């Protein structure tokens, strides 16, 4: 991702190894941090605490700006899997305005990507736990004005703000606002740093036809989001 001055080093934080694959970085497990052609990449694992630790690790490598790259769930029904959100603001609490993202980097990314990807701007909400039901998604959208939700962007933005370095996020949508995730899958996700775990596989295997259908559609849409991230990485290189 080449946004910013050519000599600047970017600290890119992703939650999952599959998200790192989209920028050509392989073999890095959660907790890892490796050099990258534009700076450093950290794979944090899922969730805010992991994301904050990863941002602090990569910042210590001497980067000039921080970025969060990965997938998010839609709160706005107009967003579909494979769409790309470049948020202008990250929020995490109803009584806090959150963090603005760097406008110059946003504009550079949007211009680079808009020829081949559907780009959306707006507020990204960072949750502590998965937002899984349609009712919860609708309530969060109405209360916050956010168009999508993730679990990592806000703590990374907070680290960037404390260090006084620019921050940007790019999120490919993997979960539509209209999807209801089975409770079995949500519980397994909530207890995992890596996304797919043995507990998730067991939850799917023993969940019955409804869970199997949900898992298939989730995997399909995650694939669409991952393809969008790979396209974005190629266009922004």
Language model segments and positions:
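Conserved active-site and cofactor/substrate-binding residues in soluble primary-metabolism enzymes
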Residues: 18, 46-53, 104, 135, ...
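Active-site rim beta-loop-alpha module in soluble metabolic enzymes
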Residues: 101-182, 186
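Metabolite-binding pocket within alpha/beta catalytic cores that recognizes anionic/polar moieties
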Residues: 2-116, 147, 162, 234
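Solvent-exposed, flexible loop/coil residues
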Residues: 75, 79, 83, 90, ...
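Short alpha-helical interface patches
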Residues: 17-28, 32, 134-142, 187-192
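Short acidic/polar alpha-helix capping motifs at helix-coil junctions
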Residues: 17-19, 118-124, 198-199
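Regulatory input/activation interfaces that engage signals or partners
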Residues: 173-237
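Glycine- and other small-residue-rich loops at beta-strand/loop junctions that grip anionic moieties
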Residues: 40-44, 98, 129, 170, ...
């Amino acid at each position: 991702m080449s946004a910013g001055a050519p000599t600047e080093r970017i600290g890119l934080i992703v939650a999952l190894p599959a998200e790192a694959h989209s920028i050509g970085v392989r073999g890095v497990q959660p907790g890892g941090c490796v050099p990258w052609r534009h700076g450093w990449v950290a794979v944090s694992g899922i969730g805010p605490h992991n994301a904050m630790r990863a941002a602090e690790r990569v910042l210590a490598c001497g980067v000039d700006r921080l970025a969060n790259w990965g997938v998010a769930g839609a709160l706005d029904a107009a967003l579909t899997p494979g769409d790309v959100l470049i948020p202008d603001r990250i929020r995490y609490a109803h009584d806090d305005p959150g963090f603005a993202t760097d406008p110059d980097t946003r504009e550079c990314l949007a211009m680079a990507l808009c020829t081949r990807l559907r780009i959306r701007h707006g507020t990204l909400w960072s949750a502590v736990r998965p937002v899984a039901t349609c009712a919860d998604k609708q309530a969060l959208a109405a209360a916050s004005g956010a168009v999508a939700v993730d679990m990592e962007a806000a703590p990374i933005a907070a680290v960037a703000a404390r260090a006084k370095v620019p921050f940007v996020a790019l999120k490919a949508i993997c979960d539509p606002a209209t999807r209801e995730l089975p409770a079995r899958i949500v519980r397994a996700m909530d207890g995992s740093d890596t996304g797919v775990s043995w507990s998730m596989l067991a939850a799917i295997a023993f969940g019955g036809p409804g869970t199997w259908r949900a898992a298939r559609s989730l995997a399909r849409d995650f694939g669409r989001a991952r393809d969008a991230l790979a396209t974005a990485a190629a266009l922004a290189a």
